Every structure is written in structure tokens, then in C-alpha cells.
Amino acid sequence: MVIKTHRNFDKQFAKLSKKQRKKVETSLALFMKNPHAAKLRCHALTGEYSGHYSISAGGDLRLHFRYLSSDAAISTAVGSHAQLYN
């Protein structure tokens, strides 16, 4: 799996603490190896975020992404549940 990042993701990622950035990096590495790993709790989003998916990076930290193809995705957002859904 190839992962690209959207500029919004890059800005949000830069604002995370060092510990949170490490969790995101670990989750992205796992996602590249196995996008359907149970630990990621990957699921499709609905409504305003239809076409996007969410994975868990631990605790309340979430990553949003869209599939570009069967082997490529773009990370579009990262943050807590409240930051992403409000």
C-alpha cells in the first residue's frame, strides 16, 4: 500500500505532540502492511464524510483517508474524535 498525505493532514500532523506523531506513524506503517488489521478498526464513514475511511491510531486519535486505487490511499485528516467530527 502506498500512502500520500494531503496538505491538511500535514498541517494537523505537525500540531500533534511527539507521542501522538509516533502513534500515527506506527498506525500508518501497519496500514501499509495490512490495511485490514483489526488493531486499526478501519471503517467507512457516512454522511458528510462519505467515501472516506477512518482508522484508529490509539486512544482518541483518528486518521481519515480515501482510497485512490486498490493499492494507494491519501491521508486527509488526523486528530481526536471531537476535532474531526465537529
Model-flagged regions — what are they?
Residues N8, S50, S80:
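Residues that form or immediately flank small-molecule/cofactor binding pockets and catalytic motifs
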Residues R7, A44-T46, G59:
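A general secondary-structure junction signal
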Residues V2, K11, K22, S56-R62, ...:
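Enriched for short, Lys/Arg-rich terminal
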Residues E25-S27, H43-L45, R66, S70:
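General helical structural elements
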Residues M1-L28:
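Arg/Lys-rich, positively charged N-terminal/basic patches that mediate binding to nucleic acids
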Residues L30-I55:
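A short, surface-exposed loop/turn module that caps and links secondary-structure elements
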